[in-house]
Amino acid sequence: MKISIIGTGRVGSSTAFALINAAVADEIVLYDLNKEMAEGEALDLLHATTFHKRMIIRAGEYSDIEGSDIVLITAGAAQKPGETRLDLTIKNAKIIKGISENIKKYAPNTLIINITNPVDVMSYVVWKVTGFESNRVIGTGTILDTARLRALIGKNCGVSPMSVHAYIIGEHGDSELAAWSSAMIGGVPIKGFCRNCPYKDNCNKDLSKIFDDVKNSAYTIISKKGATNYGIASATTALVESIIKNEGRVYTPSVLLDDVYIGYPAVINKDGVERTIDITLNDEETEKFESSKSIIKEYLESIKNLL
């Protein structure tokens, strides 16, 4: 299994390290415009393989991604404190277009996972420029947001996050929403669980506050350390594992719906996106989801001259 990573900044290098720990690849190729950084990361990561599965780790050129089973895109301008993901659109669209052209040239049969923000818009750019089938172009979408939601619900309600089934859908950004109508804890609708929870009298957070914490997580982290990297690296690795092992896990990646890439529940297997799963949304949630789609489409309109 050969995986290539385009971009070896914090996210790219953290993802490479997570992939090593997961032992899912036989070869990892790192590419970056800063060749010395890519070479340094490759050497450092190679040393880490001493304690894990034996694999090839090397820096390379675009031509070295040939034969890749999966290509991960992490390159792009960094999100600055106070800057929304959609503010990055024009800046990163040109970068992603060039990367996509090279992937199409050197690895036409690969499956692409885009991590670069704004992830929904950039995933659409990758899809349009490469001309690949939509199941082979996946964005990380709201996978990490969903994980954050489940973790915070679990902490607040005194249960394991693994027993929480709740989704963040829509844009990976300011217009995302929590699909509370379909949220469950241990098979019980979450609002029913809350009514019968023995800790309800001492609970100091309602559902909207939990969602606000999820929505602001990235901004909080960026304001304190400058970037988010470990969470998204783990989310990407989980996505890769479901593809490589053909596990059919359900995540909320950025997938093609109504000619727009957007975070939505989907089954992920060896072919990428096998299918989406329709979840129950009330009228308010449906309206918010459609609004989120419209926002992404507006930003796509702003870069249509590049595609």
From Swiss-Prot:
It is found in: Cytoplasm. The modification Phosphotyrosine is found at residue 219. Gene3D superfamilies: Lactate dehydrogenase/glycoside hydrolase, family 4, C-terminal (3.90.110.10), NAD(P)-binding Rossmann-like Domain (3.40.50.720). Beta-D-fructose 1,6-bisphosphate binds at residues 150, 165. CDD domains: LDH_2 (cd05292). Keywords: Allosteric enzyme, Cytoplasm, NAD, Oxidoreductase, Phosphoprotein. Allosterically activated by fructose 1,6-bisphosphate (FBP). PANTHER family: L-2-HYDROXYCARBOXYLATE DEHYDROGENASE (NAD(P)(+)), L-LACTATE DEHYDROGENASE. Homotetramer. Belongs to the LDH/MDH superfamily. LDH family. This is L-lactate dehydrogenase. It comes from Petrotoga mobilis (strain DSM 10674 / SJ95).
